[in-house]
Amino acid sequence: MRFSLAILALPVLAAATAVPRGGASKCNSGPVQCCNTLVDTKDKHQTNIVGALLGLDLGSLTGLAGVNCSPVSVIGVGGNSCSTQTVCCEGTQFNGLVNVGCTPINVGL
């Protein structure tokens, strides 16, 4: 009887275990950014087109690059929401137009 009770309690305890989660409006490397476009730098055709339009050599980049990004200080407050792609970027910028090392985040706007 005790063994079956322990077996039943195990999934309940596992489900109740707290899992740490990062805040939706914070990035470890800087503010949340709202980017008009995300470019996967593995797609060299897309990277070359964006680079040519902006006058930048993006060929050596890896990961995602956010194009035309602006910081979002408080998500959803005062009209400061993002209708395109919300990302966290590692902070490297080119001419203020391209952020590299970006990771999309879901903030439920």
Curated annotation (Swiss-Prot):
One of its GO terms (cellular component) is extracellular region. Induction: Expression is regulated by the mating-type genes in the secondary mycelium, and especially activated by both the MATA- and MATB-controlled pathways. InterPro entries: Hydrophobin (IPR001338), Hydrophobin_CS (IPR019778). Its main location: secreted. It is found in: Secreted; Secreted, Cell wall. It comes from the Eukaryota. One of its GO terms (molecular function) is structural constituent of cell wall. Residues 1-22 form the signal peptide. Disulfide bonds join C27-C88, C34-C82, C35-C69, C89-C102. Keywords: Cell wall, Disulfide bond, Fruiting body, Secreted, Signal. The keyword Secreted applies. CDD domains: hydrophobin_I. Belongs to the fungal hydrophobin family. Aerial growth, conidiation, and dispersal of filamentous fungi in the environment rely upon a capability of their secreting small amphipathic proteins called hydrophobins (HPBs) with low sequence identity. Class I can self-assemble into an outermost layer of rodlet bundles on aerial cell surfaces, conferring cellular hydrophobicity that supports fungal growth, development and dispersal; whereas Class II form highly ordered films at water-air interfaces through intermolecular interactions but contribute nothing to the rodlet structure. Self-assembles to form functional amyloid fibrils called rodlets. Self-assembly into fibrillar rodlets occurs spontaneously at hydrophobic:hydrophilic interfaces and the rodlets further associate laterally to form amphipathic monolayers. This is Class I hydrophobin SC1. It comes from Schizophyllum commune (Split gill fungus).
